[in-house]
């Protein structure tokens, strides 16, 4: 059993090392909940891992500055489509797991889509995106309970 686990970890590690990755921050300044409450400014640590073809996974760990002390972990799957030159757009499903003000966990399903710039001669990525979600299982006072969305600007370092 230990050998099988070791082989599995090695294979997963090599697959992550073989593909390009992006790491950086995602900063949101716009957002609302179903009751129109402003959700405040949010920041997320962001990691993208490219899969085969023009597809990738995105992992985000976020924090909210509003009074709910909301912590969020999001996973998204993106399909990428070229626009022109170094520009492309992406869209895909997303799942969020959140924790609100020591009152409980929440689960959200939604989507994420946006546009990005990956200059060929610089190891950065700049992007803007929107993430509409429907969040449930949270206490009623949490800002994200029900339908909500967020718009964000991202800056990431590209690792090839």
Predicted regions and their residues:
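Cleavable N-terminal export/targeting peptides
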Residues: 1-22
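Short glycine/proline- and aromatic-enriched beta-strand/turn motifs that initiate or cap beta-hairpins
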Residues: 16-65, 160
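Feature marks short, surface-exposed loop/turn motifs that line or immediately flank catalytic pockets
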Residues: 31, 65, 99, 134-136
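Outer-membrane beta-barrel translocator domains and adjoining extracellular loop/strand segments
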Residues: 36-39, 71-75, 102-107, 138-146
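Outer-membrane beta-barrel porins/channels
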Residues: 130-144, 160
């Amino acid at each position: 059993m230990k050998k099988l686990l070791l082989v599995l970890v090695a294979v997963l590690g090599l697959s992550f090392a073989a593909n390009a990755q992006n790491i950086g921050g995602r900063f949101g300044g716009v957002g609302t909940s179903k009751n129109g409450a402003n959700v405040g400014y949010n920041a997320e640590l962001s990691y993208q891992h490219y899969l085969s073809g023009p597809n990738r996974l995105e992992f985000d760990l976020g924090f909210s500055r509003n009074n709910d002390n909301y912590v969020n972990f999001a996973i998204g799957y993106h399909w990428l489509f070229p626009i022109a030159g170094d520009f492309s757009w992406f869209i895909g499903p997303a799942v969020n797991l959140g924790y609100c003000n020591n009152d409980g966990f929440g689960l959200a399903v939604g989507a994420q889509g946006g546009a990005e710039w990956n200059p060929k001669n610089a190891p950065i990525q700049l992007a803007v995106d929107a993430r509409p979600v429907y969040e449930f299982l949270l206490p009623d006072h949490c800002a994200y309970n029900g339908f909500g969305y967020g718009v964000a600007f991202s800056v990431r370092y590209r690792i090839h």
